[in-house]
């Protein structure tokens, strides 16, 4: 069979161990950010206008704005964005914000108001487009650029609006009684709490203020006492018959009761149930079936019941008893005397129905609506006298005014679900019925019906993403603006103004700026490597404005909840105070329009698992039985086992296969991206997996990235979605490649209006937020065909489009002379020599020349008192050359600052007079390299203020930039020409020409030869007979001219931007930024880790020949302590080691077969081996059909080690590992004989040797080591500052003092506490003594002692230091002198 498939070698092929086919595509990993913000901005207006959400809804909710008199109104018409002034790269370089100007069209309507009738008529309408500030745009990678730095807006988890029922778990009251409470939480507005107290009275609180009886709230809603009782209780009529009463028989209320006396049928007089019997449901049913209607009761049986209606004398209107009054010995005779023989009674039995609302009503002091409203007014605004109008207005504004109160669509949906209402989700305020339903449900809970809510359920927590956070912020800004507009509309002559004059957009712009600049949720992007970027964008934080605080959050909120499954990762969360408050979205999860997290499931129809995928939120999932992704299926897609493990309502259970309605999509749907990158995650302890996920985010991009032998199949997804590796936007042919850009001639999606050329700019040695190096390298060569989505270039930490955070190294698990005690790591010198763990870090230094009071600072080479040697790296302008190697103390930018005039001595005056003034009045403030940093200058940027003359260096940089832009333009022009003229000649070929250039014969049939006789620019002169073709020619011409002018225009704009001066902070004339690349080799003290939470510090780097070696003489690269495995239970690292060993063994075999093929030209053995390795899993590449060149490319990729993927929870088992080892011809134990490199002796026991993937973390000893002799002191205590950033000292703390005390080292101790710390006079003396060469000094009083004395005085204690006494005693010889 002919092998036809071609493989270009530009992606990594892996052998897949996964057995479960994935039916759903993993959603784009940064979709959370992009979709949310796009929905908010809605830059392109859809057909039919923008829907009422995002920015549109903000404007709609604030406008129209009417002035106080109602004589004019400002309406919102529409908004649009202009293109941003600077693109993403320019913003990064110039420290600007990437934003687009927002233009809003407003309409001002002026009315004429008839003074007599008050009727309005429109007098004037003016419409105008108004600039409303800049709106930050999101880059393609889901970040924002604010003042030149990349930031991420983290999504926030908060409690969903709606109604929640809960109890205090018996904590409030000593009896341990459960006090139930309900809380209505709106999206914005006042909270309403309804709660029981220990006496079972129901109270309401508004905004957590003083409580009022709930009946007052109901009265304020317009109900009276009788109506309240009839709403909450049923009524039954007791009729007088003879000397007793006839009471209706109700089986429901009697359930479970015990009879005290005999039950007698009121109609027949027979005893139906004897006294002292329990009324079982069965017995009651029998009585009902017999036709029992009513029972006989005595007067005593009525005592303790409550009246349902007022008992009124209708003639006189006298009220004998009110509704809710209790019937007892005193009241019953009153009723009988008044001649009532029918009594309406409330259906309260104290068992199924409690008298809570009735008791509340009787305890409530307010009698009517007015009292209730006044009471509420006093609670909300204490100290103000209420009037009926103000009280009514205040009460209405609390819950029933859409301006002040908003449940939001989510809140309304949740409320409908919880209270079984059916209200449209456009009703965003509370209604009377809602409040009644809440109180009813609460009373039912107290009566033992229904369940309380679990607030940690993901159905009750929702996510606010960027768009929504931004919307709230912008709304605040507009509301601030609204007040100003109203005032201005009232104070200004409205007939003469335009909308522009009324609006000051500052508050809105300030709100946006404040949100991006200083909100807790707007964070500096974690940019150590591509994984940390993606994780940061998928983070969910419970902190932030309107969220929890670390201190308040209890254990429950932080804990893993069953609803997290497939929505929030149970593994990835920080260690420390934020644990459980900051989470990560699971791989397949997405956020729905209401902000709830959804997870995908496969539908099961008639017992067969379909590929139909359904996204469900936690609330919707509760009613289903969900099987796991690894449940065994037969060929038809039915479950093999009779009982299947499944999840239902938060429990894991075995259920019959017919009950199961859904199945998970993939085994990795429950973990986050970082956790899904850990192979053999299922064999690691959860705590270590957590460390593993967190440490992968800190892996520094290495000089040479290398993809792991043992991956999980998630690597390409992360590399692609993070934007580190560049994917092709559309298919085409590579036209040009160099280190800085790739030019592709498109062959698909050829839209006439768009350019037919895609230029991809590569980032070269840029600095990331964490000072790591961002560098992209092209993978394609000229002439390659690419398809949409193909990887064109590798970025930091990517290798052939796979995420590559570390390196594969040969590991041995064994002790080695104690150098791997306590998780230390022993390395071979080969690792340093071959730059295995070398990384590049880029430091940015900036210097500003300001205009000071004494004159301007100057950036110059002419610095006083500095030798020529120190200036050797500076150019004429005083700025360091690119490529200069710099070390601590070297000058990067020379700068001088004017010094204050000091009075001159006569000698100075004489010298001045003779030599003219110079050097004396300036001081050297040059920027120098900080201590401990060595590197190479890779880039210099010079920024000048408008109108400041540019120096030579700035001009040179500008020239280079313009040349680069011109080259881009010329290349694009060339490709455009080639493309267009190619199409033109295709169109002309075979046509009959009617006209042409000079000397052309009409009627000639055109061919390539004929056309080529003329220069290209004259080809447009040909006109052809065929009208259709002629039309196409003209269209092509128009399009070509338009593209050309567009290209030129773009070039001119960019040149203009380059030449224009820069925006500078006030007082700054010039700014220089110098970027220095620092090469960091691995060294003792650096922190390293594997992917399984196995972290350690490099303790020693040993010569290669001293490292243990294998029988074939290969030395291991790294030695780890075997004791790090058992107690930590992260066995995944051992399995990874074995599998890596097998991969390397297979790679060796493939390498030998390549050599054999080169010798004999027979490719079959190679093809067979590769075929055998890849196997035929559901995700395997079709290697079988590769052509010979492709097989060789793949073999070349695999000769160092075969790449495999073992997905989480669906990876290689023990049998697979053994099979791989056998295939590689290695021992199935995975252990080898090792020899000691120093003595050459064999070690007694076999040692586990293999390849493990190690990462170098961003905790490098070079950044941490620090020393100080003199430096800054704290202002108050006069002690040295702390920390490397402040150039501080080392803290000699309490315990260290004890140590010196224990040694009896009195003088050392005295020195530590005085002259080396805060004895101000003493330390100056010591300095002077050292300078003189003396070694005598005296310690004085530490400043902190004085601080203590002052603090005690501030407490009102008179503390005196009686120093004189000590001196006197010493003088009198009663105290010994200090020892010499």
From Swiss-Prot:
Q: Which family does the similarity line name?
A: Belongs to the RNA polymerase beta chain family.
PANTHER family xrefs: DNA-DIRECTED RNA POLYMERASE I SUBUNIT 2 (PTHR20856)
This protein's UniProt keywords: DNA-directed RNA polymerase, Nucleotidyltransferase, Transcription, Transferase
UniProt protein name:
DNA-directed RNA polymerase subunit beta
* Alphabetical list of Gene3D superfamilies matching this protein: 2.40.50.100, 2.40.50.150, 3.90.1100.10, DNA-directed RNA polymerase, beta subunit, external 1 domain, DNA-directed RNA polymerase, subunit 2, domain 6, RNA polymerase alpha subunit dimerisation domain, RNA polymerase Rpb2, domain 2
Report quaternary structure and partners.
The RNAP catalytic core consists of 2 alpha, 1 beta, 1 beta' and 1 omega subunit. When a sigma factor is associated with the core the holoenzyme is formed, which can initiate transcription.
| Superkingdom, natural source | Bacteria
